[in-house]
């Protein structure tokens, strides 16, 4: 079980990312565009640097939906490998069966 503060901080980061996502995309498009003037590109870079660090998507950590475990995360289920195995054995995941060959 992850600390509640870590889970809360990650949720806060998700909210910040959502708030700044549109503006960040606009600024990055300006920076990448080869037809942009050097002055506009520099202004866009400065504005991007002024935004909070937590506005970047890469700072959000994928965590287990049940207990917040940060490692062994399976995107398809939104769970860690440990929790996915437990729930699959109990039959709580529809369409998931134990493999046999």
UniProtKB/Swiss-Prot annotation:
Gene3D superfamilies: 1.10.287.1480
Keywords: Ribonucleoprotein, Ribosomal protein, RNA-binding, rRNA-binding
InterPro entries, per database record: Ribosomal_uS14, Ribosomal_uS14_bac/plastid
Key word Ribosomal protein present: yes
Pfam families: Ribosomal_S14 (PF00253)
Keyword Lipid metabolism recorded: no
Role: Binds 16S rRNA, required for the assembly of 30S particles and may also be responsible for determining the conformation of the 16S rRNA at the A site.
UniProt-recorded name of the protein: Small ribosomal subunit protein uS14
Organism of derivation: Corynebacterium efficiens (strain DSM 44549 / YS-314 / AJ 12310 / JCM 11189 / NBRC 100395)
Subunit structure: Part of the 30S ribosomal subunit. Contacts proteins S3 and S10.
Protein family per UniProt: Belongs to the universal ribosomal protein uS14 family.
Molecular function GO terms recorded: rRNA binding; structural constituent of ribosome
GO cellular component, one term: small ribosomal subunit
BP GO annotations: translation
